[in-house]
């Protein structure tokens, strides 16, 4: 009986246990439904959680926060010039909108450079966020694009100052250059980055821009603008960035393509793959992973195994979880620029296309470079460098030459960007060269001013100049003459003047026009190769144009004898040649100055001496009487064949071209002692003994030295020679009077004959009467009109009374 009672109790217990088990299955099923029947949501993978939090931080504000932001924010108006600039940028670059991402990433890179530089001397600078990255996230659902950097960030004042009065000092210049580029049909996209107004390009694709920024010295603030006005407010969310800046673009409808991951990735690789900080894009990929089997399947197997007595023993042993392979979409930050800094790689491993892409990314130019050189310098200082020569000269290359930042060399120390604002990394005349320099030998934790005085910088500069000149020398002749010289020829001439140590190297790069060819330019090496057998000087003539130089009386005999003459047609040319004492052992000779001599035979020498003796009376008469106090001396010329005379400067005096340049200087006040000394130097008056005018003058002065006509002729010849020789006349009225007197004599008109006086006009008597009649008629017409108006007014008044 007791056995039956025990058996019944066991059955009851088994039944109750089965019901509890079923209840537990139902509860688990309800939980699964609440979680979407997914076990992924219950995972606690730390890396997944961290990635999700990073993605959430990049999202925009919620509705209540946006409402609070707009209600409490302080409103500002853009400056008029900034408004104009924004409109110009938006309208001129509408076909090249994609550059907005290049500019935003470039700004982010600059901010990262700044905080990294600060961290070298401030150990707490990176405490808010030790990561130095740029992150980009597309939000298709909300139509937002986020670009976040962990750079230096901006305070409230900096948000207003930097984003509200964009490019303060350069705004006007930028507008002018933008307008010029549009008028010339040139590309304007590179101007955006060059003038520091790249942030404005965000409005090419965005209706609204929101900038969230956290600086170490301020709380987090939000700057918002629709391109018409902007507002700033403290971020109601508090410090969500740690440090840095997030730029959120509310994209225009037609710019939705920039929310596509492939588009963003392609743009990053196109424009920013050589940025020195990692750039990440929040992107997805499909992975095959092993997941535990569903609990229902596991429970079913456990139920089947519970019927087997052997399963009791196996339950005590550790079981391996059963899994299955499934495909799932995983979101993570994908690195876009994993390429090592190009200058750190061996030059043999870098393709030409990589150099071109790096140049465009780093210089913000749209054209390929004309030339480049990649080298490692060793010795007193070791550094790596890449230098580029642009295809065209930067705009405003000589504006304020030497008085502001004039080079485009970025200095890195151990891959840390230090500055691009050194004034003497390259000499002024090479201010068009762009590149990077990276050295491990320079100190990191010093100020820029201290670093600028570091002795190793002088060594680096010296090597950079040598390598640059080697690079330029290797440019193909056709490209050099057709492109480089047109763009940068003036720089090379300035280098000859300024750089004494490299003057010989620079002289080989000079190009000038010459009498050898009507259009082609020539080098000094080529000139020397073509020199005559006994020619020991390089002849040159300076003028405002080639036509003026080749028609000068000074080159007549040289050209007739077959000598090649170099024509200097630019204002800087004569300074350049004056700075060159010689080239390849040949001295330079300005044919407008004393010293032009030709190799002559004994017979020719005797003939010349006989002519000088024959014309000695005329020469003495000119020096002592006709042109007294005007010339140093008068001599028989060896350089004239067609012209009657010329005015020749001394070896240390000014030529006509130089005098014209000096007197045209804006700062010329007439009080400079050296300038006045050169300007007052008397010239040598050379005559052509074979010219009929000169021969007739000799005859006349032998007959009568006091002949007024001959005296006038001598002065007119002197003044004409002054003009032909390139000088300016001090008294043009007197010159004009003398020419008129000579014309009167040639036409047999009395030199004292007066100009006929104009007859006096008689006054018209009827004018006053006619005027009075006209005024009377007008008065009568006005009276009649007034009477008619008064009658009409009276009628209207009567009618109104009748109606009342």
Curated annotation (Swiss-Prot):
Its main location: endoplasmic reticulum. Residues 1-21 form the signal peptide. The keyword Transmembrane does not apply. A motif (Prevents secretion from ER) lies at residues 801-804. Belongs to the heat shock protein 90 family. Residues 288-323, 750-804 are annotated as: Disordered. It is found in: Endoplasmic reticulum lumen; Sarcoplasmic reticulum lumen; Melanosome. The record marks 448 as: Important for ATP hydrolysis. This is Endoplasmin. The lineage of its organism: Eukaryota, Metazoa, Chordata, Craniata, Vertebrata. Residues 792-804 have a biased composition (Basic and acidic residues). ATP-dependent chaperone involved in the processing of proteins in the endoplasmic reticulum, regulating their transport. Together with MESD, acts as a modulator of the Wnt pathway by promoting the folding of LRP6, a coreceptor of the canonical Wnt pathway. When associated with CNPY3, required for proper folding of Toll-like receptors. Promotes folding and trafficking of TLR4 to the cell surface. The modification Phosphothreonine is found at residue 786. Its EC number is 3.6.4.-. It comes from Pongo abelii (Sumatran orangutan).
